[in-house]
A protein has these predicted regions:
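C-terminal motif of bacterial Sec signal peptides marking the signal peptidase cleavage site
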Residues: 27-30
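Regulatory alphaC helix of protein kinase catalytic domains
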Residues: 71-135, 139
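Amphipathic alpha-helical coiled-coil scaffold segments and their short linker/junction regions
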Residues: 136, 198, 318-327, 331, ...
Length: 601
């Protein structure tokens, strides 16, 4: 039973109501920015849950590192370069090239500059292995991109989870209409508000409720002559029974949740690769430092040979060309030293780019190298470990499951459409601003079934075939990934053996070169300048190759651990060693002479 409707609202009251509705709408819009904080907190929780699910709690991006410096505006500003961005590309005639004046270089001055050493700037920041990785985690562009890629996957999951949560919508439509009533033209001011709530059902379908409220004022010569208000409440239910029924309805949500796990694996796999890349670059710098130090020692040895030969020439005991041979070799080595120092400076700048350090600031690379013992390798067990533990292979395996599910979903789309629906309306005709009485008798309702016969399902059947072909592709890609992993594990094992073999050979070469040098020093008159310079060169070459072999052994061990899925890295730049692996370092000057087993600082 509906109460009689009476309207007591004057024109000023109607305008106040309209203003109130608009103020509420603007207030809701102003709260949007605050919701971004909640989104970040929710995304961080999803990231932590995903990283915990793969037992890598340290593998969580820092959201404060991924905050955008540009917050955006609701409307894009117009500018002259909006449609055609400007390009700066002067012609050859507009360029100015300043040629350097030709002048004779002072060779002695160049030699002094090349062979002299200068201390690093006092404000230069010092880096060791762990500090390099810690800094790279915070500042590296490469690491930041990987974090943001992981974060984007979490944001996609938030979207899907929100779609599957209760959703409320409210649309307010104020409008002015020209209407004709009994051949008389009049103007109507109308305010329509539609408030609805929707909820997806877990196995397909949706339930929703909506309230549609309308208020109209008929205006004639700027005077309200009548008012009409109405409200309608509707309930709707739709449930698919064949096509679209079952877990196929949740496909996007299921895939987003699985993608979150894939993202966690991919980010952790990137961290391990990035760790090796940073350590490899760092060890390269340490090796180059050692090579430069060895070359400087070579220059000093050659300098003493040149001085001796010059003295012999002056005393008449040696012909001049023999002394010139020694001088020529010394000049070649000095030139090589200049090249090595330039290569080192470039490598340092590239290392700064790798870890995100400012390239115009000086840094000091501390002489430090890992000293891991080579593992005992069982080829079959190593490959089996890689198949079981490698994160990328686990993702490739799970993508086969995804492809099979897509075939099932494509099969579901071929079925007939059979949807059960039910609707109910609760009508009323009150002034909803002053009170609402609804008709709760549910006399307006409908229940039925919508059937879509599968007459033309050619496109859907083609999609089934496409899904089957894609499944075969993904399955073959998984097999190929396994075979590739087996090859990589074998190659990593051989790399360790080859590096150890090279290291042992260079130890022998150093002993031989030193014995040769000692023999020459014991009987200097029996050796020619060429013999002396060759002995110096061979000792330098052996020491350089040993430094490279030391680096190669450590990187090969790290790569083997990664290829077999055994590498674990903490956020402080340290290896989380499994039982049986002791993490040690070589530190300070004279890395080649240090025995193995220096404990971490």
């Amino acid at each position: 039973m509906q109460a009689p409707f009476t309207n007591t609202c004057d024109p000023e009251c109607s305008r106040q109501r309209l203003l109130l509705v608009l103020v509420v709408a603007l207030t809701l819009q102003s709260c949007r920015d605050e919701s971004l904080v909640a989104i970040d907190a929710d995304a961080e929780r999803r990231l932590r849950e995903a990283s915990d699910s793969i037992r890598e709690p340290a593998s969580v991006p820092l959201l404060n590192q991924t905050e955008s410096k540009y917050q955006g505006t609701p409307f894009t500003a117009d500018s002259p370069g909006l449609n055609q961005p400007p390009t700066v590309n002067p012609t050859a005639e507009e360029l100015d090239y300043q040629a350097r004046l030709k002048q004779k270089l002072d060779a002695d001055r160049v030699i002094r500059e090349v062979t002299s050493t200068s201390p690093p700037p006092a404000d230069a920041e010092r880096f060791n292995l762990s500090k390099s990785f810690q800094y790279a985690i915070r500042k590296s562009i490469e690491y930041r991109v990987a974090e943001e890629t992981y974060l984007l996957i979490a944001l996609d999951l938030l979207i899907q989870q929100h779609i599957w949560s209760p959703r409320i919508f409210d649309t307010i439509t104020p409008q002015v209409q020209g209407v004709t009533v009994d051949s008389a033209q009049s103007t109507a001011l109308q305010l329509v508000n539609e408030l609805s709530a929707r909820q997806k059902l877990p196995y397909g379908g949706e339930i929703s409720a909506s309230i549609l409220a309308q208020a109209s004022n008929e205006l004639q010569e700027a005077v309200i002559t009548g008012q009409t208000n109405s409200i309608d409440v509707a309930l709707n239910l739709n449930i698919p029974l064949l096509r679209g029924a079952g877990l196929v309805a949740q496909e996007d949500l299921i895939q987003s949740k699985r993608n979150m796990v894939y993202g966690a694996r991919a980010f952790e796999d990137f961290r391990r690769r990035f760790y090796i890349a940073v350590f490899s670059d760092y060890h390269d710098l340490v090796v180059q430092q050692q090579v430069i130090a060895n070359t400087r020692a070579q220059v000093e040895r050659l300098r003493s040979i040149v001085e001796r030969e010059d003295a012999l020439v002056e005393s008449g005991r040696q012909v001049a060309f023999q002394a010139d041979l020694a001088k020529q070799r010394a000049l070649f080595v000095i030139n090589n030293l200049a090249t090595l120092e330039e290569i080192y400076k470039l490598a340092v700048d590239r290392f700064k780019l790798r870890i995100g350090y400012e390239t115009d600031k000086a840094i000091v690379i501390e002489p430090e190298m890992l000293d891991l013992d080579a593992p005992t390798i069982d080829p079959g067990q190593s490959i089996a470990s890689a198949f079981e533990w490698r994160l990328d292979l686990q993702t490739a395996r799970d993508r086969v499951v995804d492809s099979r599910r897509k075939v099932d979903n494509a099969r579901n789309a071929v079925l007939a459409g059979a949807d059960f629906f039910a609707t109910a309306s609760l009508l009323s005709n009150p002034d909803f601003f002053n009170g609402v009485q609804l008709d709760d008798t549910f006399n307006n309702w409908a229940v039925g079934m919508a059937v879509d016969l599968p007459i033309d399902r050619t496109i859907e059947e083609v999609n089934v075939r496409k899904a089957q072909v894609l499944l075969e592709q993904v399955d073959r890609q998984f097999v190929f990934a396994q075979n590739t992993a087996a090859v990589e594990v074998r190659q990593a094992a051989r790399r360790i053996d080859r590096a150890l073999y090279t290291l042992a050979l260079q130890d022998k070469n150093i002993d031989i070169a030193r014995n040769r040098q000692a023999s020459i020093d014991a009987a200097p008159d029996r050796a020619s300048p060429r013999d002396r310079t060759e002995a110096v060169d061979e000792l330098n070459r052996a020491e350089n190759e040993k430094a490279r072999a030391l680096r190669e052994v450590q990187i090969a061990v790290l790569e083997y651990l990664r290829q077999t899925g055994q590498l674990r890295v903490s956020d402080d730049g340290e290896i989380i060693a499994p039982p049986g692996l002791q993490v040690r370092y070589r530190r300070g000057a004279g890395l080649l002479e240090q025995p193995a087993g220096i404990p971490p600082a």
